[in-house]
Amino acid sequence: MSESQPPRRGRFPLPLSATTPVVRRFVSTGQAVLQPVPPRPQRPASEITRETARPAILAGHGLDSDGFRARMIERLRADGCRDEHVLRAMSRVPRHLFVDSALAAQAYEDTSLPIGHGQTISKPSVVARMLGLLRQRPGGAQLGRVLEIGTGCGYQAAVLCRLASQVYSIERLKALHDRARENLAPMRRDQLRLIYGDGLHGHGPNAPFDAIIAAAGGHAIPQAWLDQLAVCGRLVAPMHDAQRGTQVLVVVDRMPDGSLVQHRHETVRFVPLESGTSDYKPA
């Protein structure tokens, strides 16, 4: 995901009318073929001192204070985020409980952090941006059934639970699936279902979805995701842009007539979208 950068002018909101849309109508001609994408980690793990992955239980560290989250929210608001529903949801989720204790002091900074297995937790501004875009779907801001591709440590799923009535989150790495389950257990969110599986195929049993959000990017949007998007639904995902030679945020809307319309937004940096599952756990 996008790396830490020097302060810049506000990025929120960025209405679709303010962009130069690339409109495409998709024709279902079979499964989209993904080509290998060079790894694009949000932040090299070597740049950050870390210890063996374990939940950040930080009694006495002071990070349980609401003040830390409040300051994070104020920074997002100052940067231009105007979706108060997203900001309120993020203010209620303790991000430090989803990262390793060695990194907890950085939990409320606007930076991505490693969570092991070559994956990262998204920086708060990226989470706010993508969720804000998700809520601007043609069917309205109220989200019903949402599919998250790439559970990771579970942080974004926890935020989504405060914005949607049903959240399905799928993770291909068993170790991260288990970690997310452990992280989310104390929150007891009845509307959340965690799935261990190949996110490349979406999650057909509970489709269609009002919204689909992905935490990894490939060369094309998988056909399964498009097929599982409800009428008036919206998909937000990173995708490789051949013209720019980098990843961009892509928004795909299923219009009332069933057609699919795509818009491309700013440059981002996400880990690559991969197929299959892995139950590998380090010794």
Swiss-Prot record:
The active site is at S122. The keyword Nucleotidyltransferase does not apply. It catalyses: [protein]-L-isoaspartate + S-adenosyl-L-methionine = [protein]-L-isoaspartate alpha-methyl ester + S-adenosyl-L-homocysteine. The keyword Cytoplasm applies. InterPro entries: PCMT, SAM-dependent_MTases_sf. One of its GO terms (biological process) is protein modification process. Coiled coil: none annotated. Its main location: cytoplasm. Its EC number is 2.1.1.77. GO terms for cellular component: cytoplasm. Keywords: Cytoplasm, Methyltransferase, S-adenosyl-L-methionine, Transferase. GO terms for molecular function: protein-L-isoaspartate (D-aspartate) O-methyltransferase activity. It comes from the Bacteria. It is found in: Cytoplasm. Catalyzes the methyl esterification of L-isoaspartyl residues in peptides and proteins that result from spontaneous decomposition of normal L-aspartyl and L-asparaginyl residues. It plays a role in the repair and/or degradation of damaged proteins. NCBIfam families: pimt, PRK00312.1. Belongs to the methyltransferase superfamily. L-isoaspartyl/D-aspartyl protein methyltransferase family. This is Protein-L-isoaspartate O-methyltransferase.
